[in-house]
Amino acid sequence: MSQTHKHAIPANIADRCLINPEQYETKYKQSINDPDTFWGEQGKILDWITPYQKVKNTSFAPGNVSIKWYEDGTLNLAANCLDRHLQENGDRTAIIWEGDDTSQSKHISYRELHRDVCRFANTLLDLGIKKGDVVAIYMPMVPEAAVAMLACARIGAVHSVIFGGFSPEAVAGRIIDSSSRLVITADEGVRAGRSIPLKKNVDDALKNPNVTSVEHVIVLKRTGSDIDWQEGRDLWWRDLIEKASPEHQPEAMNAEDPLFILYTSGSTGKPKGVLHTTGGYLVYAATTFKYVFDYHPGDIYWCTADVGWVTGHSYLLYGPLACGATTLMFEGVPNWPTPARMCQVVDKHQVNILYTAPTAIRALMAEGDKAIEGTDRSSLRILGSVGEPINPEAWEWYWKKIGKEKCPVVDTWWQTETGGFMITPLPGAIELKAGSATRPFFGVQPALVDNEGHPQEGATEGNLVITDSWPGQARTLFGDHERFEQTYFSTFKNMYFSGDGARRDEDGYYWITGRVDDVLNVSGHRLGTAEIESALVAHPKIAEAAVVGIPHAIKGQAIYAYVTLNHGEEPSPELYAEVRNWVRKEIGPLATPDVLHWTDSLPKTRSGKIMRRILRKIAAGDTSNLGDTSTLADPGVVEKLLEEKQAIAMPS
């Protein structure tokens, strides 16, 4: 259970680490026993306009879930990420941008980024955007995406970043739910040599009759391709920024003022707008960034995540910039145009800290030594993994091949809702085990409970909960606090339920075992099965659908959809392709089912509930123990599904 082999802390890390094993134990104990003192001290990592007196004011009690940190303090996120660095480090590179095309890259200093953010902040104000308004950002991985986010934070507008891979329908849904007043996009995005029609997708999204709040669309010229233009509504980024003043005084924000909404998949269909506020979130992003990556001034840091995900918010931009770091933003993909691209970028920019996803690691691992061919990688000091549990084989390959057996791998477990790292090694403090997220970060109190909510002691397995609040915790779901309580605090009373299962070994190390609810993890991205099922049954020929995840060598999980057609409809290769494209259009390429399993009926209980447990086992080819099928209305369905499964070609 524990995988006994531990990787010791390398001498070069131990010699200069920010936190050693003794300090970890001492600080962790203090953070749990006296969170007010501990987090009161950590809050000083930021500059405050009005210093806080209160630190923690939180409740997980049923019907009274309330989370407030530093609630009487005021600050500005952009001032903490930019202005305060100007005097001593204005000429330090804030963002290294590496384009999709290997010949394109640029360095943007803190002073230049500050100037651009001030200009764009003034642009937003000129367009009538004010504190509390929601701005939707649907951008490629270009520095202007960071400028837009920081400018929103500077004036107190709430940003809602939408991943560039989402479809027009998904974009519309997020704009409607958040009542966004402005959309910021580009003519096109570029990824692995292909262009992505971002402006066209926005145009299509805004045709939805329920989108009534958007007044303007700001468009960045990325490729220069022809796009449709709506006079009066659409505005060019460059025209606006050229006439805007580079002087802007940042808005004083209360620590509990909203900073951003980020939509994440739920198990019940409609995506949830996770709301983070300003003070506690930034304290947590900066503190976790500093200690987990053992950040030293001058380090070059690269997080491969897209800005459209929480990792891009906390650990591509806000955490690093709050610490005055140099952060690398990459427009492309790790294995294009050659499998060695990621390592080439590491060498080109002399990256010291690399933070990427198991999906990328497994894709490179499949290429063997081609992934490292002709590269040196000796600048690397720390490696990190994010997005899903990393399997021990991929962990060992990453450590051995990319890090040359000298770089600790920080395998970080956290979520959109947690704002920052929850369970993670600290490089100089915790010995590593391949595949384990190891120990909790300061102030984080994990527990494993059984299905009745009873805490399980010692080496055990169970539902992963957190028993007390931490500063980076999401405060609510936008416009739906009731759903927030229902989703995270109703399963187990007085605890935050992560939706993940985990096991703890005899050393107290945590091993994440994956979702225990109906949320899939595809290439590190969360997708709700209900969301995909809703898209499937919206197809005119489909009567019913059930979606489950199956193990996939590269993506972690693949999407397996059981589909029942309307009476009189017949399966065909044409319909197979049509249904997959339909889901792609409704949600986005990420949600495209890998397998469609045509069937006449699904296993249901007498009350009509679909038995997903059985569907998961059949899809994964695990038929050794299907459990009790006596509660099924028609137990014969299972045999039929098993027969059909034999004829299905599975994705490799």
Curated annotation (Swiss-Prot):
UniProt GO BP: acetyl-CoA biosynthetic process; acetyl-CoA biosynthetic process from acetate; chemotaxis
Binding-site list for ATP: G387, E388, P389, D411, T412, W413, W414, Q415, T416, D500, R515, R526
Site label Hinge residue important for conformational flexibility, positions: D517
Protein name: Acetyl-coenzyme A synthetase
Outcome when changing R584A: Results in a 2-fold reduction in the catalytic efficiency for both ATP and CoA. 2-fold increase in the affinity for ATP and 7-fold reduction for CoA
Keywords, in A-Z order: Acetylation, ATP-binding, Ligase, Magnesium, Metal-binding, Nucleotide-binding
Classification via HAMAP family: Ac_CoA_synth
InterPro entries: Ac_CoA_lig, ACAS_N, AMP-bd_C, AMP-bd_C_sf, AMP-binding_CS, AMP-dep_synth/lig_dom, ANL_N_sf
Disulphide bond pairs: none
Gene3D superfamilies named among the record's database cross-references: 3.30.300.30, N-terminal domain of ligase-like (3.40.50.12780)
GO cellular component, one term: cytosol
Species, as recorded: Salmonella typhimurium (strain LT2 / SGSC1412 / ATCC 700720)
